[in-house]
Swiss-Prot record:
Belongs to the bacterial ribosomal protein bS21 family. The keyword Chaperone does not apply. The lineage of its organism: Bacteria, Bacillati, Bacillota, Bacilli, Lactobacillales. The keyword Ribonucleoprotein applies. Pfam families: Ribosomal_S21. Residues 43-58 have a biased composition (Basic residues). This is Small ribosomal subunit protein bS21. Gene3D superfamilies: Ribosomal protein S8 (1.20.5.1150). One of its GO terms (biological process) is translation.
Length: 58
């Protein structure tokens, strides 16, 4: 879980910007979207294979 303490004389917008950056860096939202719905093992394998094929292409 990402935590951000608001510093002295720091605006709320700046603290929110730092929080969003830390959440993005940790990959929290990406993980949440991935786990939002159950993914069958066959679909997971297919997605992984597609990603590998895409990486190999370039």
């Amino acid at each position: 879980m990402s935590k951000t303490l608001v510093r002295k004389n720091e605006s709320l917008d700046d603290a929110l910007r730092r929080f969003k950056r830390s959440v993005t860096k940790a990959g929290t939202l990406q993980e949440l979207r991935k786990r939002e719905h159950y993914e069958k093992p066959s679909v997971k394998r297919k997605r992984k294979s597609e990603a590998a094929r895409k990486r190999k292409k370039y």
